[in-house]
C-alpha cells in the first residue's frame, strides 16, 4: 500500500469517535465498515479476538471483558483494566480505537496513513495530553498536533464564516463529558479566552435515568429486579438510548421489549410510552448542571452574556430539546446547529490536519489556552507561578531565582500546577534536581528556570545554573494526571480560600524577608568587624535578637515591624559593605589593566570575557 501525505483528523471521544480528512478543499467524514459516520469508543475482548466499535458496544453489559469510556482514565499513571489476566493501560485501549479509525481512513483513501491530528477536551492537563499522544504512537500514528475539542469545533464553523470579528461560546455536551469554551475570532485568529466543564456529565447519564426509571417501574409491576439480569439490562440500555434520540424529534417514544426476562409464571414483557415531558422530568437536574460551567466560563473570560455573538452546539446530546431551550433561555441566543454536532470536532481536526499538510491555504490560526497555572515551589512552601492559567499556548516563560542557603550540592526543582498560593495545596507534576554544583554563597548563585508549553499543551521545564551553565531538563508526563473534577475543585478552592491564602502568604513572605535580613546582617557584621564600632554592633545585634524573638511567634505585623527596625539600624553597616566592595572592585580593575598592558595580545586574537545578559 502506498503512503499518503494527508494528515487525518480524529475526534477521540468518550462515547463515540470520528475520523475525517481533507479532500478537494473540504473536510469529509469517513464512514466506518458498518456505514456509520461515528464509531463507538468501545473495545471488547473475546478469546484472542479484539472487537472495536458497534460490535463491541452491543456487548457492554453481557461481556465483562468489554471496555467503554476509557477516555475518563487517560493520564492516570496507575490505572489499568484486567482482561483475561492481562493488564491494559488507558493508552493501549485508546490505541485500539485509534488503530480502528486509522484502518477506516486507509480503506477509504486506499493508502497508508501515518499522521494525525487528535482532539482532546480543553480541560485536559499535560499528563492526559501526553497519554493521548502515546496512544496515537501505539496505534502507528505520528500525532502532529493535539488540539482542544471546542477549538476544533469553532474551526470547522469558522472556515465557512470567514474572518468576521466575533466572540463564540462552544457548548459541547457529548456522551461522557460536558465542556464550555469561549473563543474570539479576530483577523483569522481563534483565541480561547476561557474553558470550563463537568467531566461526569454526558449523554450516558441521560440514558441511565431512563434505564433506572424503567427498572423501578418494572419492579413495581412484576416484583422482578431487572438490574440483576445482564441480558435484560443490555436491551434496556439500547432501548433507552434509542428513546432518548427519538424524543429529540417527537414528543413520545414507545419502548417495547417483549420477552425481556422470565419469572416463575413465564416470560415477562416491558411496554412503556416515554413522553418528552417525562424524560425532561427525569433529567431536569442534569440539565441544570449545565449552567454552572457556562457561568464559570463567562466569569473567567470577564464577559457578559450580551457579548456572546454566537453559540455553537457540539456533541450528540445537544440535540436534546431541553438542552437547546436552556441555551436559548440563558444565553439569549439561538444556537448554531448548521453542522452535525457528532461530526463537527472531527471535521475541525481534519481542517487542522489540512493546515499542517498544506492542503488548506486560507489558514485560521489557533490560539489555545492552558487550564491551570504552572510554576515551582520556592522558599517557605510558596507556589511561584511562571505561566498563568488561561495563558495562550504555545508559550515560554523564564525567571531567575537564587538559592536559600550557601553551598548546596544540589537544587530540587518541584514543578506544580494549580491556583493556590501555597505549593502543598497544588498538584505536583514532577521533580528533578540540578546536581554536582560547586560551593557557592547563596547570593551569588543564580538559577534560570524556563517553562516551555508547546502547542499540544505539554510542558517542559529547564533549570540552568548561570554560574556553571549546567542544565537539567524534564518533560512532564503521566504521573501528573488531573481530572476535570480536580481542576474545578482547585479553581473553586482558590476562590473560597483567597483571603486565608493571602494571610498565609503574607506571613511566609514576612518570615522569608526577616530571615534573609538576619542572614545578610550577620554576614556583614562578620565581614566588616574591623570597620564596625562596638556601639554600632551592639545596636544591630539587639535588633537581630528582637527579630529572632518575633519569628518564634505568629504575629506577622510584629515581624514586619522588627524587620523594618533592623533594616534601618543596619543601613550604616550596609553602606560600609557597599563602599568596601567598590574599593575592592577598583583595585581588581587596576590590577587587571596592568596585567593586560604587560601581556597585550594581537587585535585579531579572541579573548574570553564575562558578560551580563540584559533582559
UniProtKB/Swiss-Prot annotation:
Residue ranges with Acidic residues bias: 605-615
CDD domains listed in its UniProt record: ASKHA_NBD_HSP70_DnaK-like
Biased composition (Basic and acidic residues): 581-591
Stated induction or repression of this protein's expression: By stress conditions e.g. heat shock.
Stored Pfam families: HSP70
Keyword field contains Chaperone: yes
Chain positions covered by the region annotation Disordered: 567-615
Range of residues in the leader sequence: none
GO molecular function: ATP binding; ATP-dependent protein folding chaperone; unfolded protein binding
Residue numbers of Phosphothreonine PTMs: 177
Lyase as UniProt keyword: no
InterPro entries: ATPase_NBD, Chaperone_DnaK, Heat_shock_70_CS, HSP70_C_sf, HSP70_peptide-bd_sf, Hsp_70_fam
Keywords: ATP-binding, Chaperone, Nucleotide-binding, Phosphoprotein, Stress response
NCBIfam families: PRK00290.1 (NF001413), prok_dnaK (TIGR02350)
Family to which the UniProt record says this protein belongs: Belongs to the heat shock protein 70 family.
Function, in words: Acts as a chaperone.
UniProt-recorded name of the protein: Chaperone protein DnaK
Classification lineage: Bacteria, Bacillati, Mycoplasmatota, Mollicutes, Acholeplasmatales
Gene name, Swiss-Prot/TrEMBL: dnaK
Amino acid at each position: 500500500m502506498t503512503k499518503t501525505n494527508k494528515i487525518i483528523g480524529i475526534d477521540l471521544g468518550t462515547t463515540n469517535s470520528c475520523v475525517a480528512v481533507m479532500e478537494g478543499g473540504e473536510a469529509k467524514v469517513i464512514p466506518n465498515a458498518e456505514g456509520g459516520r461515528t464509531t463507538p469508543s468501545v473495545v471488547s475482548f473475546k478469546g484472542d479476538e479484539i472487537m472495536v466499535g458497534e460490535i463491541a458496544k452491543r456487548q457492554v453489559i453481557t461481556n465483562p471483558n468489554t471496555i467503554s469510556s476509557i477516555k475518563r482514565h487517560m493520564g492516570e499513571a496507575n490505572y489499568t483494566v484486567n482482561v483475561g489476566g492481562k493488564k491494559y493501560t488507558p493508552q493501549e485501549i485508546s490505541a485500539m480505537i485509534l488503530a480502528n479509525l486509522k484502518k477506516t481512513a486507509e480503506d477509504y483513501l486506499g493508502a497508508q496513513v501515518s499522521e494525525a491530528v487528535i482532539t482532546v477536551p480543553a480541560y485536559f492537563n499535560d499528563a492526559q495530553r501526553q497519554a493521548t499522544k502515546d496512544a496515537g504512537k501505539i496505534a502507528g500514528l505520528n500525532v502532529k498536533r493535539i488540539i482542544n475539542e471546542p477549538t476544533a469545533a469553532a474551526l470547522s464553523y469558522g472556515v465557512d464564516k470567514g474572518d468576521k470579528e466575533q466572540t463564540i461560546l462552544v457548548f459541547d455536551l457529548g456522551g461522557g463529558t460536558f465542556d464550555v469554551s469561549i473563543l474570539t475570532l479576530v483577523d483569522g485568529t481563534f483565541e480561547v479566552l476561557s474553558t470550563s466543564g463537568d467531566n461526569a456529565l454526558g449523554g450516558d447519564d441521560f440514558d441511565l435515568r431512563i434505564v433506572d426509571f424503567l427498572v423501578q417501574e418494572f419492579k413495581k409491576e412484576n416484583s422482578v429486579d431487572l438490574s440483576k439480569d445482564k441480558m435484560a439490562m443490555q436491551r434496556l440500555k439500547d432501548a433507552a438510548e434509542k428513546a432518548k434520540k427519538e424524543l429529540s424529534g417527537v414528543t413520545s417514544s414507545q419502548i417495547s421489549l417483549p420477552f425481556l426476562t422470565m419469572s416463575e409464571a413465564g416470560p415477562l414483557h416491558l411496554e412503556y410510552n416515554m413522553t418528552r415531558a417525562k424524560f425532561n422530568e427525569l433529567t431536569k437536574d442534569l440539565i441544570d448542571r449545565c449552567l454552572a460551567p457556562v457561568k464559570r466560563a463567562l466569569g473567567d473570560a470577564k464577559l457578559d452574556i450580551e457579548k456572546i455573538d454566537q453559540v455553537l452546539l457540539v456533541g450528540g446530546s445537544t440535540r436534546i430539546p431541553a438542552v437547546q431551550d436552556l441555551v436559548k433561555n440563558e444565553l439569549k441566543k439561538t444556537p448554531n446547529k448548521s453542522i452535525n454536532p457528532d461530526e463537527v470536532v472531527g471535521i475541525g481536526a481534519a481542517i487542522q490536519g489540512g493546515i499542517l499538510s498544506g492542503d488548506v491555504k486560507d489558514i485560521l490560526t489557533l490560539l489555545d489556552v492552558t487550564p491551570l497555572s504552572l510554576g515551582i515551589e520556592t522558599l517557605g512552601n510558596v507556589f511561584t507561578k511562571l505561566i498563568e492559567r488561561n495563558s495562550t499556548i504555545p508559550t515560554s516563560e523564564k525567571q531567575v531565582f537564587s538559592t536559600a542557603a550557601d553551598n548546596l550540592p544540589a537544587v530540587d526543582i518541584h514543578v506544580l500546577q494549580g491556583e493556590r498560593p501555597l505549593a502543598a495545596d497544588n498538584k505536583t507534576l514532577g521533580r528533578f534536581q540540578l546536581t554536582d554544583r560547586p560551593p557557592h554563597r547563596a547570593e551569588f548563585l543564580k538559577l534560570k528556570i524556563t517553562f516551555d508549553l508547546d502547542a499540544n499543551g505539554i510542558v517542559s521545564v529547564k533549570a540552568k545554573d548561570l554560574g556553571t551553565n549546567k542544565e537539567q531538563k524534564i518533560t512532564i508526563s503521566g504521573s501528573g494526571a488531573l481530572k476535570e473534577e480536580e481542576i474545578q475543585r482547585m479553581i473553586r478552592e482558590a476562590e473560597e480560600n483567597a483571603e486565608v491564602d493571602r494571610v498565609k502568604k503574607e506571613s511566609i513572605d514576612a518570615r522569608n524577608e526577616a530571615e534573609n535580613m538576619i542572614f545578610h546582617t550577620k554576614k556583614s557584621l562578620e565581614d566588616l568587624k574591623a570597620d564596625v564600632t562596638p556601639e554600632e554592633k551592639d545596636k544591630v545585634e539587639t535588633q537581630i535578637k528582637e527579630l529572632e524573638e518575633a519569628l518564634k511567634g505568629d504575629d506577622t505585623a510584629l515581624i514586619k515591624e522588627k524587620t523594618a527596625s533592623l533594616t534601618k539600624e543596619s543601613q550604616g553597616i550596609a553602606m560600609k559593605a557597599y563602599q568596601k566592595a567598590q574599593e575592592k572592585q577598583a583595585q581588581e580593575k587596576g590590577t587587571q589593566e596592568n596585567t593586560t598592558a604587560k601581556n597585550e595580545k594581537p587585535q585579531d586574537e579572541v579573548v574570553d570575557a564575562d558578560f551580563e545578559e540584559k533582559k
